């Protein structure tokens, strides 16, 4: 019985930091470039949250994920992924495109 407080303290010391770390982690989302288009074409994200955005390029050519609205510009090699951290973002629409082929566009709607 006298070891119960020690056990509870040890349990809390091991368990609670993991809970706090998971709560602080950015929410994961993915945009995929395949067959010359982004999917989804319009990604909905929550406002005022940190976001971990994976940009996956399934095409055979490299692409450049670019957005002046988001102030991001990053090359994605063929058949590769990049991670882009965003936010917290305010409500609105944020456009992006492939700078190597500007006809390939998408948008992020934040609500």
Question: Model-predicted segments: where are they?
Answer:
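N-terminal post-signal-peptidase region of extra-cytosolic proteins
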Residues: 34-41, 69-70, 79-84
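Bacterial N-terminal signal peptides that target proteins for export
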Residues: 1-8
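Histidine- and aromatic-enriched segments that form or immediately flank copper-ligand environments
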Residues: 60-78, 106
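Residue-level recognition of conserved beta-strand positions in structured domain cores
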Residues: 33, 55, 67-69, 86, ...
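C-terminal segment of classical bacterial N-terminal signal peptides
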Residues: 13-21
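Extracellular/periplasmic metallocenter environments
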Residues: 24-30, 76-111
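N-terminal edge beta-strand
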Residues: 25-48
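Beta-strand cores of secreted/periplasmic/IMS beta-sandwich domains, seen most often
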Residues: 41-59, 81-89, 95-97
């Amino acid at each position: 019985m006298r070891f119960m407080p020690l056990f509870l303290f040890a349990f809390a010391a091991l368990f609670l930091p993991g809970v706090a770390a998971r709560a602080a982690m950015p929410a994961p989302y993915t945009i995929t470039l395949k067959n010359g288009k982004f999917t989804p074409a319009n990604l909905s994200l929550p406002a005022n949250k940190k976001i971990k955005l994976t940009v996956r390029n399934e095409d055979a050519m490299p692409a450049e994920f670019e957005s002046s609205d988001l102030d991001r510009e990053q090359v994605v090699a063929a058949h590769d992924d990049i991670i882009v951290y965003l936010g917290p973002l305010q409500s609105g629409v944020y456009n992006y495109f492939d700078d190597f082929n500007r006809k390939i566009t998408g948008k992020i709607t934040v609500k």
